[in-house]
From Swiss-Prot:
Alphabetically ordered keywords of this record: Acetylation, Cytoplasm, Disease variant, Initiation factor, Leukodystrophy, Protein biosynthesis
Gene Ontology BP, a term: response to heat
Regulation: Activated by the chemical integrated stress response (ISR) inhibitor ISRIB which stimulates guanine nucleotide exchange factor activity for both phosphorylated and unphosphorylated eIF2.
Protein's UniProt name: Translation initiation factor eIF2B subunit alpha
Gene Ontology terms, MF aspect: guanyl-nucleotide exchange factor activity; identical protein binding; translation initiation factor activity
Gene3D superfamilies linked: Translation initiation factor eif-2b, domain 2, Translation initiation factor eIF-2B, N-terminal domain
Compartments, record wording: Cytoplasm, Cytosol
Record's disease association: Leukoencephalopathy with vanishing white matter 1: An autosomal recessive brain disease characterized by neurological features including progressive cerebellar ataxia, spasticity, and cognitive deficits. Brain imaging shows abnormal white matter that vanishes over time and is replaced by cerebrospinal fluid. Disease severity ranges from fatal infantile forms to adult forms without neurological deterioration. The disease is progressive with, in most individuals, additional episodes of rapid deterioration following febrile infections or minor head trauma.
Function text: Acts as a component of the translation initiation factor 2B (eIF2B) complex, which catalyzes the exchange of GDP for GTP on eukaryotic initiation factor 2 (eIF2) gamma subunit. Its guanine nucleotide exchange factor activity is repressed when bound to eIF2 complex phosphorylated on the alpha subunit, thereby limiting the amount of methionyl-initiator methionine tRNA available to the ribosome and consequently global translation is repressed.
Positions where N6-acetyllysine occurs in the chain: 35
SUPFAM superfamilies xref list: NagB/RpiA/CoA transferase-like
């Protein structure tokens, strides 16, 4: 499976199921790559998978694709320590890969079950941009016969908040799209904030769509709970202390980074994500359970060791 086939398979997965997270599509692609790989050594197979992850990150530069790929590789690689025979080892690696994929496929439902209980009847919720996990949580709240209304930011520059509003309208949830600049104004009307995350970092902070940080700052100033919902495959080994510590490969789209290689200054480009410090986050709802920001590092160590 060469780079071109790898990229085409990844894009076809995204096209087949628009509701699928890019990280899940990447893991499905890596599993298919593993099945088709014609390498003859464990070391060679690992090297090929590492190269495939780098190729996928070149197509989709999101934090989740990077962390999901690395966690997938670590999860299946445990088999190489248990078996010396290559064919048997590869078979076990494929089985472990399929198990990993099944586990992450259940993540959103687990998170929804945990989080929707925090939504009280008659609540007003503020959310940011389009998040499949947040949408699943709100679907669970609707299924539990809870009445609530939602404010969603339009989320420039791609207006993904309007996509979220459309999805909520299909659920018959009262929803209002507000300007990104109106977050401080609208916060006093909200009872709680729920956002997704592209990545959860080692100190319990998050990397998410640009504008998340200012929403968290406003929520903290007005004593409103700020909840984050994220799957465990988004836990990434990164320890930013401020916005400048977030690597450019995560801040900008893959196409922008390719143009930047020709000499264009990235200072002229708008970042797509920002960093939100753990001190601004109330709780994180994950498929591993409900975590305080300070507990994230322990869970992250368990995942990566």
């Amino acid at each position: 499976m060469d780079d071109k086939e790898l990229i085409e398979y990844f894009k076809s997965q995204m096209k087949e199921d628009p509701d699928m997270a890019s990280a899940v599509a990447a893991i499905r692609t890596l599993l298919e790559f593993l099945k088709r790989d014609k390498g003859e050594t464990i070391q060679g197979l690992r090297a090929n998978l590492t190269s495939a992850i780098e190729t996928l990150c070149g197509v989709d530069s999101s934090v989740a694709v990077s962390s999901g790929g690395e966690l997938f590789l670590r999860f299946i690689s445990l088999a190489s320590l248990e078996y010396s025979d290559y064919s048997k080892c590869k078979k076990i690696m494929i089985e472990r890969g399929e198990l990993f994929l099944r586990r992450i496929s259940l993540s959103r439902n687990k998170i929804a079950d945990l989080c929707h209980t925090f939504i009280k009847d008659g609540a007003t919720i503020l959310t940011h941009a389009y998040s499949r996990v947040v949408l699943r949580v709100l679907e669970a709240a609707v299924a539990a016969k809870k009445r609530f209304s939602v404010y969603v930011t339009e989320s420039q520059p791609d207006l993904s908040g309007k996509k979220m509003a459309k999805a909520l309208c299909h659920l018959n949830v009262p929803v209002t799209v507000v300007l990104d600049a109106a977050v401080g104004y609208i916060m006093e009307k909200a009872d709680l904030v729920i956002v997704g995350a592209e990545g959860v970092v080692e100190n319990g902070g998050i990397i998410n769509k640009i504008g998340t940080n200012q929403m968290a700052v406003c929520a903290k100033a007005q004593n409103k709970p700020f909840y984050v919902v994220a799957e465990s495959f988004k836990f990434v080994r990164l320890f930013p202390l401020n916005q400048q510590d977030v690597p450019d490969k995560f801040k900008y789209k893959a196409d922008t980074l390719k143009v930047a290689q020709t000499g264009q200054d990235l200072k002229e480009e708008h970042p797509w994500v920002d960093y939100t410090a753990p001190s601004l986050i109330t709780l994180l709802f994950t498929d591993l359970g409900v975590l305080t920001p300070s507990a994230v590092s322990d869970e992250l160590i368990k995942l990566y060791l």
